[in-house]
Every structure is written in structure tokens, then in C-alpha cells.
Amino acid sequence: AINVGSLFAPTTAVGIKRWAEESLGYSSNDAYHFSFMVACAALILSILIYYAFRFTFRHVEGGKKKGEAAVVEDNLTPEQTKQRIVALCLVFAVVIFFWMAFHQNGLTLTYFADEFTETTAFGFDTMLFDVWNLALIIVAVYATFSIFQSDSAKGKLFSGVLASGVLAFLVYRAMGIEPNAEIAVAAPIFQQFNPFYVVALTPVSMAIFGSLAKKGKEPSAPRKI
């Protein structure tokens, strides 16, 4: 859900900023505040939804029942303890350096995109900067995997029709683009590609790990990360 929201957030933020500039007359330096305002309102709404519907998932929340016996854990050997500490250190190293780089996405990399990348797309490339085209590609990927994973013939048929329809629509849109067509690309739009790859490649990675698991070669969690 986070990555789906991150996929649409750049386009939404740019659209709100443009609306504030064109309709309300705000300068570029002030109009972006409206995008943050909408994000803040969405966060407040999500918290309200969480507490309003908390009763629907309270049964899966943590906590021990009254009178429940305490769980006695086995003592680990020094070798087992060492293995777990090494695994934790590997995870910590990956997580620390990943987030050090990832958190540059909202500021440093956006500055880089604004100042050092081409902000105009031409021809077929214009499709890649339309978030709806990326969303359709994701639908096509999941529908294609569903063809092989569905247990019923009806499910396979529906998935096949959906994947074929989406791909046909994308081809139709691509054929309607003139070679000299061009669009201006705002720097924040480049942020939509990371969540796109995360969502689109999730079934691919799951299929790979599932295949390895069947062969008894599934990598450990640190190796997956």
C-alpha cells in the first residue's frame, strides 16, 4: 500500500501545486505548500480510519490473554547466539545504508533530477512519465502471473483476458503518439519509478523465491534483503 501511494503521490503533488499556481495565483515557491497540506490531511484521515475501524482487526493485535501461561524459551548455545548476532549485524548494515541512500530521494535526488536531467520527454518516452500507464503495466504483470497461479479455468481465463486487454490498450495508446510529441517533466515525477519497480517486480521476486523454496534452496531473510 505504501508503494502504491508513493507511485501516485508525485503526480498528485505536482497537479496540486500547478492548480495553486494557475487558479489561486500563488508563486512556485509558495504553491508547493498546498501539496504538503493535502498530504497532512490524508495522514489525519488515515489515523481516523484506523481508530474508527480498529474493532475489525482487534483480534489480531498483540498481547497475552489473561491466565495464559508464560512461554518458556530454550536457552541458545553460544554458537546459535553468535549466528543470530551475525545475522542481525548483516541486516542492520543493509538497512542502515539502504535508508541512507533512499532518504535522498525526496530532496537530493529531486534536486539532481531538476538540475542535471532532461526535463522534456519526446515520442514514446512520454508514456513512461504518465502514472496511469505505469499502473496499467502493473495490472498486466499481476494478471499475467495470475494466469499461471490461478487454480480454476475461469480465473485463468479472466486473468488472460485482463492482461491481453491492458496490453492492447497500452499498444493503442503508444500508436497514437506522434514521434515529435513532447511533454515537460517535473522533477518530482522521477520519484514514481522506484515504487513502480517495487510493485511490478514483487510477483517476479516471489516466484523466484517460491521456486527456490520448492528445491530446498530458498535464501535466508538477510540474503533476500
Predicted regions and their residues:
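Intracellular loop-helix junctions on the cytosolic face of multi-pass helical membrane proteins
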Residues: 14-183, 205, 209-215
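Extended hydrophobic secondary-structure segments that form protein cores and membrane-embedded regions
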Residues: 1, 34-39, 223-225
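C-terminal substrate/ligand-recognition segments
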Residues: 158-160, 186-225
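Hydrophobic alpha-helical transmembrane segments of integral membrane proteins
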Residues: 6-7, 199
